[in-house]
Amino acid sequence: MTYYLDFEKPIQELEIKIEELKKLSDGSDIDLTQEIKRLNKKLKELKTEVFSNLTPWQKTQIARHPERPYTLDYISIIFEDFIELHGDRRFGDDPAVIAGIGKIDGDPYALVGHQKGRTIKERIYRNFGQAHPEGYRKALRVMKLAEKFSIPVITMIDTPGAFPGIGAEERGQAEAIANNLMEMSLLKIPLIGFVIGEGGSGGALALSVCDKIFMLEHAIYSVISPEGCAAILWKKNSDVGVEDYMRAAEELKLTAQDLKKFGIIDDIISEPLGGAHREPQEVGKRIKAKIVSVATELIKIPPDELIKKRYEKFRKIGNFWGSSNRRK
C-alpha cells in the first residue's frame, strides 16, 4: 500500500479513483478506457503542478519518506557481486553503515553508505541510520582498503545525523567524524558522493569529503534538521510547531537546488514525478550512469592533483566577497 504525505492527498484521491475504475472495467462489460485515460492525464498534470512547486519543508518530508530507496536498495540495482565487509577492527560492527566492495559493469568499486531500515525491527537494528563511531571507522577502513587497490569509492549519504548517545560519545564520536574528514581529504583515489535522502549534520559530512558530490532532486543536506533549528531559535514557553519547521527549512537552504546554486554540490540527479520511491529502478540507473561517467574522468587525474583539487573544492565553500571599507 502506497504511503502518501499530507500534501499528496489530492493525488491519492485521484489514484484511488483510477484504480476503482480499472477494477470496475475489468469485472464488467462497461468500457471505461476513455474515462481512465482522461483521469490519468489529469493525474499527471496534478503531479507536475504539485512537485514543481514544493516548499523546502515538503522536500524534507519526501527525503524522509518511509518508502524512499535506501543504500541497500541502490546496491541491488547498481552493483554486481557486492560483498559487504563488517567491523572497524577496534570495537565492533555498526549496522547503520553499509560498507563493501562490488562491481559496476565489471569494474571494481568500494561503497560506504548509511542504512536506515525499512521495518520497525530493521530500523531499530540499523539505529534509524544514525551511525556510531565504529560505523565511521568501518567506512574509513574500507576506503583505505580501496586506496590500497586503487579502487574508486562511492558514498551514499542518508542519515538524520550521527548518533548522540552516551556510548557513542564515550567511544569518540567527534574524533571518528573528524578523522574521516582528514583522512578522506588525503585519499589518493576518486571519491564520489551521493546524498540520497537526508544529509544531516556531521553524520553526513563524515562520508561527504568527495571529489564530486551529487544530490537527488528531493534530498536535503544541512547542518541541522528543521525541527532542531526551530527548537533552538524559537522555542520559548511553548513547543514549536509545523509553521516553525517550515520557516526553519526555508532559512536553512537545505534543498538540492539551493546547494547547487551556492556551489556546495556539483549537480542534481532528477527524480521521477512523486519522488524516487515511485520508480527506484529508474533512479538507480541514473545514479549508476553518473558513477560511471564521473569515475571515468576522475581516474585519469594523477593522485596528487586529485588531492589538490579536492582541497581547493572544499576551501572554496563559504567564500564570499565583502567590502574593503572597514569601520574605524
UniProtKB/Swiss-Prot annotation:
Pathway it belongs to? Lipid metabolism; malonyl-CoA biosynthesis; malonyl-CoA from acetyl-CoA: step 1/1
Q: Which reaction does it catalyse?
A: N(6)-carboxybiotinyl-L-lysyl-[protein] + acetyl-CoA = N(6)-biotinyl-L-lysyl-[protein] + malonyl-CoA
Q: Which UniProt keywords apply?
A: ATP-binding, Cytoplasm, Fatty acid biosynthesis, Fatty acid metabolism, Lipid biosynthesis, Lipid metabolism, Nucleotide-binding, Transferase
| Main localization of the protein described in the UniProt heading | cytoplasm
Q: What subcellular compartments does it reside in? A: Cytoplasm
What residues does the CoA carboxyltransferase C-terminal domain cover?
A: 38-297
Query: Can you supply one Gene Ontology CC term for this chain's record?
Result: acetyl-CoA carboxylase complex
Ranges annotated as spanning the membrane:
none
Function recorded in the entry = Component of the acetyl coenzyme A carboxylase (ACC) complex. First, biotin carboxylase catalyzes the carboxylation of biotin on its carrier protein (BCCP) and then the CO(2) group is transferred by the carboxyltransferase to acetyl-CoA to form malonyl-CoA.
Q: Which NCBIfam families match?
A: accA (TIGR00513), AccA_sub (NF041504), PRK05724.1 (NF004344)
- What is the designated name of this protein? Acetyl-coenzyme A carboxylase carboxyl transferase subunit alpha
Give the species this sequence originates from: Thermodesulfovibrio yellowstonii (strain ATCC 51303 / DSM 11347 / YP87)
Q: Which gene encodes it?
A: accA
